[in-house]
Amino acid sequence: MDLEIFTLRERPDLRPLVFASELQSVWSEFMRHSAAAELYFATPMFDGYLDYAFAGVADGKVVARAFSVPFAFNIAGRAELPDGGWDQVIRWAHDDRMTGRAANSLSALEISLLPEARGGGNSLALLDAMKACAKTKGFAEVFAPVRPNQKHLQPRLPMRDYVETLGPDGLPIDSWLGTHLRAGGKIIKIAPYSMTIVGSLADWSRWTGMSFDRSGELLVAGALSPVMVSREQDCAV
């Protein structure tokens, strides 16, 4: 499949298609309710990121999307990548925009492909589009708070143990981590509370169709770790 890649600045007509239900459904419903995601995708904010948002088109159909965000790194208070990962880099980018601080780095946020577009190097093509964008903007580095795409199969395994489990090829057993390493990336650190999703028990029931009727750990399909439930506080994380 030959994939043409455009920024949403170049092709604003593709914006509604990038958010059409077919691509939205690539992610579990609960994944759409991170406070950081709501900040990034809010219309006034997202309008400022169109140079860093990509649509992949094949045979006239949008079959892939990729989002990234520019931010300032190696400045006061940001000498290291954040433990908050995905969430924190969005907040950093938001703070930079609000204060007029110039960005010097790019962070990938998401690459999603419909099943028909997977394989054949399309995810690498989208990564390359991000790297080319960063180079054009004069950014020094490209980072990615990678969400391992098979970790949900072992939700109780600590993330560090999962990441350090290697296959016969010497790469992590997780195919998405392996893709980034083969593309020239390196693992810098674990972000222990990246993409934290907080909601009331009613919220989580609505997102998952499950009953949250007891406190403790609950395994939720698609989650990378057990969801921590408090009936007493009417909250789950």
Locate the predicted segments by residue.
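Short amphipathic alpha-helix that is part of the acyltransferase structural core
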Residues: 1-85
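Short, histidine-centered active-site or binding-site loop motifs used for metal coordination
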Residues: 23, 110-112
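Conserved acyl-donor/pantetheine-binding loop and adjacent beta-alpha core of acyl/acetyltransferases
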Residues: 68-110, 148-173, 191-212, 218-220, ...
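Conserved acetyl-CoA-binding loop-helix of GNAT-fold acetyltransferases
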Residues: 113, 118-136, 141-144
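ATP phosphate-binding glycine-rich loop and adjacent ATP-lid/helix-beta elements
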Residues: 177
